[in-house]
Amino acid sequence: VPIYNRLSAQLAYIIAMYRHRPDLIARLREMIEAYSLAQKSCYGKIGNSVHIVNTGTIRNVCIGDYCQIDGTSRLENGSINSNREAPVYIGPNVTAEDFIVSSGAHISDGVVMSRCFIGQACHLTHLFSAHDSLFFSNCQSENGEACAIFAGPYTVTMHKSSLLIAGMFSFLNAGSGSNQSNHMYKLGPIHQGVVERGSKTTSDSYIL
């Protein structure tokens, strides 16, 4: 799923799940590419009333109005779509590259993310790590890991040692130490998972 500023859960679902409609997917990708080219810039941008303190590297990032960046380690090649009504907070020790963060998001406390889309009012904190993943509105992620997941609205994974791989979720509550995987070790990746809306995984559960 290509990420861009206006990506919605509905559009991402169509692109991810309707690959048997190649003409539709090709046209959607063309529209996304056209929008992306219109937004493309050789320079980063810092909007009005932005607060940046004790921060390491910021390179090729578009920062929206009223964003707060405090103690962040590294931000590279991304967009932070903050605004006055819903400012974005990027806190201590965050490392992010190839990302888009939507309005009202809160990312702090050592989060590491790469090639991710973070939706409106999402909270990622407490050493959570993610790559190649989509998080849509009001997701909350702490402590665990995510790899190539489609986290629909209100997906929650707050416990330590939780691992979500190659799955699609919404209104999920992942238990402590739960593992949703797409491979059996030596066999390598074999499929992707779809967990029904509103599911709850128990502690130390394993779903293949």
Model regions and ranges:
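Structural signal for interior beta-strand "rungs" in well-ordered beta-sheet cores
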Residues: 37-208
